[in-house]
Amino acid sequence: MADHEASKINHDNHLLLDQPLLRLPYELLRKNFRSAHFTVEKESTTLNKLLKETAKGSLDGKTSPEDVVKNLDTMIAKMRGMKRKLSTYANEETRLYKQLDARVAHLRELSDMHSVEDVKYEAWSRKRLDRLLVDYMLRHGYNTSAQALANEREMHDLVDVETFLTMSKIRESLENGSVTEALAWCNDNKKELRKLQSNLEFLLRCQQYIELLRINTPSKSVEAITHAKKYIAPFQEQYPDEVREMAALLAHRPTDKNLPLKYAAWYSPDRWTKLATSFVEAHNKLLGLPTFPLLHTALSSGLSALKTPACHGTQKTTSSSQPGHSQTSMTSTVCPICSIELNELAKNVPYAHHSKSHLDNDLLLLPNGRVYGQAKLDEYAAKAGLAEGQVKDLVTGEVYSRTALKKVFA
């Protein structure tokens, strides 16, 4: 009964991990619809205004036939332009719905499985691992490798390559000292960023201002003041302290001696890295993406199931080679949680909750403090070809007499 419960698939827990799989296409569909709606509203307003002016001028005789024809040509051109834009939005909507259908079908496959022993579960689990690996690589800039894996596994509709490629491009531009693409992204998502109370646009405008001051010439100083009046002053109510510091930077240039730390921080080259990080955080929050890669979440869950209070310790083991050769000492981890690859990730996860204990019968305590079941010691001694009355530690290889062993439970 216990084995059956352990092998049973918990569909709710799987869906918790795979929430972003459905959420991102949904958020992108909303964004696509808002963009299409804005285009229709904007172009319709312009067309209606021009149509009314043309009709009124034509009826009043104030507009010549040539101007009427010219206005009609302008309206036709605008309509064609709007049609092209709407076609682009329609194609994007079709792509996103196709993506969403594929992801729902992928999750529906899991709903038909009820045990990890199902032959189909291994293939499904492998596909999910591939998805998590692509997500991890895209988040860390390994775009070529991520695309290669997605192509090999034929799972383009299950991963968000285009979204992360766009994010990666803007992040790299910030790391290379350019705010142009990031500001364009902020302009496209102005309303949403305002709802999230994001300060990204303000930080980008401040960086533009700082770069003008860094040049430290009279013409650039005037340009910086003009920039501050237009783009930084409107944020005075939201970020009063930062705006005052921006004004003070006019009197504190990066070449000044004994530059106060708070002003030196604004001129630090590290600010580009911080801006890139701020952009990624705003991007993920806007699209409802997790802060950390889903691979970390999945690994943390598995690590927590294995972690015990004995973890993060090491045990020195001594292995002896053939007679006459020196002994070598090596340090091996007690469990996989303590391995170099997983140690850091496992540090902050909780310990496993075990409601049932599984102990061998007739536990025996070895002189080195290790405990094993008698059956295991007997089996290992037979395999090792030990003399009668001797046992061997399964980990360290140390040999002891049976008389030196103590029963754990009398």
Swiss-Prot record:
Annotated LisH domain residues: 125-157
Pfam families, sorted: CTLH (PF10607)
Swiss-Prot/TrEMBL keywords: Cytoplasm, Metal-binding, Nucleus, Zinc, Zinc-finger
Biological-process GO terms, alphabetical: negative regulation of gluconeogenesis; proteasome-mediated ubiquitin-dependent protein catabolic process
Entry GO CC: cytoplasm; GID complex; nucleus
Zinc fingers (RING-Gid-type) by residue: 335-396
Residues annotated as domain CTLH: 163-220
GO MF annotations in UniProt: ubiquitin protein ligase activity; zinc ion binding
Region (Disordered), start-end ranges: 310-330
Subcellular location: Cytoplasm; Nucleus
Compositionally skewed regions (Polar residues) per UniProt: 314-330
Disulfide bonds: none
General function of this protein: Involved in the proteasome-dependent degradation of fructose-1,6-bisphosphatase.
Protein name according to UniProt: Protein fyv-10
Protein's organism: Neurospora crassa (strain ATCC 24698 / 74-OR23-1A / CBS 708.71 / DSM 1257 / FGSC 987)
